[in-house]
């Protein structure tokens, strides 16, 4: 909460939006004057942002942006001959060669492995074999065999072709442990050696990002608490999470990257079964528990922690087809810094180069060109790199540009690089990500995801002011956009990150957020995401200027960015940034 002591000053001294969202307490002062004394961290950051100036050289470089260059990059990267840029295909290789050529022409140095631009990302493909995968419920000596695809689905085990388990089942509410938010379903329950069962989702009282993170961390939390399996199922109101809705996706192969020891990452080998269960089957788990399914649902709807034994056991066998040998590649270019002390620190730009490749035809087309997703982000970052190359004096800190692989497989290229960077991890000070920035209308306002979490907000505000765009609030907080692209891989490593998206203002009667949501509903991840779309190249150029200036100001600052005091993600991950 912000405390404002209200005392007379001109209205334009402080941002109006802060005045409308802060708690004001008026004090009559003996002089009968009123001065505003703002006692909150958010305002301190805003005021400090006003002191950030953009040097003339950087201003001039920003004005040299070329919209036609962005378009040319996009046209090549989304051409049919690249066949959708799926990792491991000739099309992705053509895209990688193109990015390497651009880095070379701009004077960027190779920053990959073995003196080249590339970093190999070893990938493992895993897919559950239906015919060899089973699940049964055991209660009072009676066994009920379940039907795969009707009653349940299993997730692949990335580290074992056959995984078997039989254990009692304990219900743990949402399966969330967040004591920092005053909530812990695991408090007072011992789940060691047991299978936990829980609802999908997280308490609705959590802020949107914390809620999304808590939902995504269920497996990790269960494994940390000693569980040997996890079963999830949806609340009756959560149609999107039901296994019937996700049946096609549940049958697809999935991927993880592997470490030097051949272990798949972001997996938890102690979890011998990871299952999702249909509504009717989930209800049957509570048949002889102390609470019914309906009582547990009501408790969850009240956002109250809960846990209790279900007095039932589950037996499961997961058969997984595991395929190794696929190598993705990140493409990494370096612009060395110029400050003797700061040149060994790095500001990292990322955008994913990969897309979906060739899939089933839609409207007679089977090539997923990925013009907006994400030839647009790569092209904007390439033009931002060109602006850096035109500076008469390069930034104090070094700049890395990374064209990533494996985003469409689950942020794999960024997670691999952030976990295994080609520069010292503790020297990476900030990340800027661009993924589908959405320039189908004039760019009049932006949503800079991540700026609310760290001191990078100052650089964002200064850049936005120069470019002439307003900073808007997140119009779709329920979508948890902050966790849904490659920048979050850096957040997981404790590195502050910014992810800029276009806002809702279009300058006419259209609403940018509605345009975006409609696009996602009709064009996203289809072959129709090609160059036959109404791109606004002036808006794209403004995205370039923003990317360039935010990174430039971060690279020039005396101090590296820091997480805001008490920030959820800074508290959870910030300590990792100091690990080499």
Language-model-derived ranges and their functions:
Residues 386, 390, 504-573:
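His/Asp/Glu-rich mid-to-C-terminal helical/loop segments that flank catalytic regions of hydrolases
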Residues 147-265, 336, 369, 373:
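Extracellular/luminal Protease-associated
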Residues 53-58, 140, 151-183, 266-370, ...:
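Soluble metallo-hydrolase cores and metallopeptidase-like ectodomains found primarily
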Residues 146, 260-293, 404-509, 513-515, ...:
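Metal-dependent peptidase/peptidase-like ectodomains
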Residues 49-112, 344, 579-580:
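N-terminal hydrophobic or amphipathic helices/low-complexity stretches enriched
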Residues 56-64, 80-90, 156-160, 181-184, ...:
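Second-shell loop/turn segments in exported
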Residues 213-217, 238, 357, 363-455, ...:
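Acidic/histidine-rich catalytic neighborhood of metal-dependent amide-processing enzymes
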Residues 80-196, 200-203, 328, 455:
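Noncatalytic luminal/extracellular "stalk/propeptide" segments of secretory-pathway proteins
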């Amino acid at each position: 909460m912000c405390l404002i002591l209200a005392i007379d000053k001109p209205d334009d001294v402080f941002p109006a939006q802060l005045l409308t969202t802060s708690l004001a307490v008026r004090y009559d002062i003996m002089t009968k004057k009123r001065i505003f004394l703002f006692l909150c961290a958010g305002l301190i950051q805003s005021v400090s942002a006003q002191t950030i100036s953009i040097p003339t050289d950087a201003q001039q470089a920003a004005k040299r942006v070329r919209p036609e260059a962005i378009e040319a990059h996009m046209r090549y990267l989304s051409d049919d001959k690249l066949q959708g840029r799926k990792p491991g295909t000739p099309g992705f290789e053509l895209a990688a060669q193109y990015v390497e050529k651009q880095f070379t022409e701009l004077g960027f140095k190779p920053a990959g492995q073995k003196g080249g631009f590339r970093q190999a990302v070893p990938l493992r493909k895993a897919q559950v074999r239906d015919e060899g995968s089973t699940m049964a419920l055991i209660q009072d000596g009676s066994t009920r065999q379940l039907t795969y695809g009707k009653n349940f689905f299993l997730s692949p085990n990335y580290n074992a072709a056959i995984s078997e388990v039989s254990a009692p089942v304990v219900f743990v509410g949402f399966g969330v442990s967040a004591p920092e938010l005053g909530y812990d379903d695991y408090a007072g329950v011992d789940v060691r050696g047991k299978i936990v069962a829980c609802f999908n989702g997280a308490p609705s009282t959590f802020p949107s990002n914390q809620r999304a993170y808590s939902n995504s961390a269920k497996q990790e939390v269960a494994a940390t608490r000693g569980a040997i399996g996890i079963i999830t199922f949806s609340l009756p109101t959560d149609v999107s999470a039901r296994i019937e809705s996700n049946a096609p996706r549940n049958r697809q192969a999935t991927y993880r990257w592997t470490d030097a020891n051949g272990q798949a990452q972001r997996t938890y080998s102690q979890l011998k079964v990871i299952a999702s269960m249909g509504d009717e089957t989930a209800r049957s788990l509570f048949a002889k528990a102390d609470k019914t399914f309906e009582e547990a649902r009501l408790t969850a709807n009240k956002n109250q922690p809960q846990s209790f034994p279900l007095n039932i056991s589950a037996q499961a066998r997961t058969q997984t087809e595991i395929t190794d040998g696929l190598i993705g590649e990140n493409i990494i270019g370096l612009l060395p810094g110029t400050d003797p002390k700061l040149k060994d620190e790095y500001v990292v730009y990322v955008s994913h180069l990969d897309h979906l490749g060739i899939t089933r035809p839609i409207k007679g087309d089977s090539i997923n060109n990925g013009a907006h997703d994400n030839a647009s982000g790569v092209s904007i970052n390439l033009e931002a790199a060109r602006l850096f190359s035109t500076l008469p004096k390069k930034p104090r800190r070094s700049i890395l540009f990374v064209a990533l692989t494996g985003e469409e497989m689950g942020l794999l290229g960024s997670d691999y690089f952030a976990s295994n960077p080609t520069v010292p991890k503790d020297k990476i000070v900030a990340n800027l990500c661009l993924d589908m920035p959405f320039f189908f209308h004039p760019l009049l306002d932006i949503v800079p995801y991540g700026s609310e979490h760290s001191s990078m907000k100052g650089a964002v505000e200064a850049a936005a002011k120069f470019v002439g765009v307003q900073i808007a609030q997140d119009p779709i907080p329920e979508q948890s956009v902050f966790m849904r692209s490659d920048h979050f891989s850096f957040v997981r490593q404790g590195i502050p990150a910014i992810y800029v998206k276009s806002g809702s203002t279009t300058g006419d009667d259209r609403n940018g957020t509605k345009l975006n949501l409609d696009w996602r509903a009709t064009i996203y991840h289809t072959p129709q995401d090609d160059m036959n779309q109404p791109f606004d190249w002036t808006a794209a150029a403004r995205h370039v200027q923003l990317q360039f200036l935010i990174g430039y100001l971060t690279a020039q600052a005396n101090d590296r960015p820091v997480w805001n005091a008490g920030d959820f993600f800074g508290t959870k991950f910030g300590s990792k940034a100091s690990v080499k």
